[in-house]
Design a protein with these regions (language model features):
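Acidic/glycine-rich C-terminal interaction modules and beta/coil loop segments
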Residues: 1-101
Length: 101
């Protein structure tokens, strides 16, 4: 899918389809298209695509636990628990959500 620089800005982007309901409180629903800016770093609070230590990608909010002194991935649905893992790699940061009408 070609993405307009005037809408999305410069950089390398890709689109993925959200699967599941773990991000519903961030207004990301099952089946939504998510525009991801490809980058290896992110800020706390960003919604990121992260590859976990088991090789799977997940879309979650990046947070930091001051007591544990570690980053974790936070689902935006209270039915799911935070993901504390030893290692994960940021694959990109969500920039836009595209919803079907």
């Amino acid at each position: 899918m070609p993405l307009s620089v005037s809408v999305f800005g410069t950089g390398s982007f890709y689109v993925l389809r959200a699967s599941g309901d773990s991000m519903i409180n961030a207004d990301i629903d099952n089946g939504d298209l998510i525009v991801i800016k490809e980058q290896k770093t992110a800020n706390i609070g960003d919604i990121v695509v992260a590859m976990t230590d088991d090789g799977k990608n997940t879309l979650k909010r990046l947070e930091y636990d001051k007591e544990a002194q570690s980053y974790y991935l936070h689902p935006e649905n209270p039915a799911y628990e935070d993901i504390y893992i030893k290692e994960f790699r940021v694959q990109g940061v969500a920039s836009h959500v595209i919803k079907a009408l």
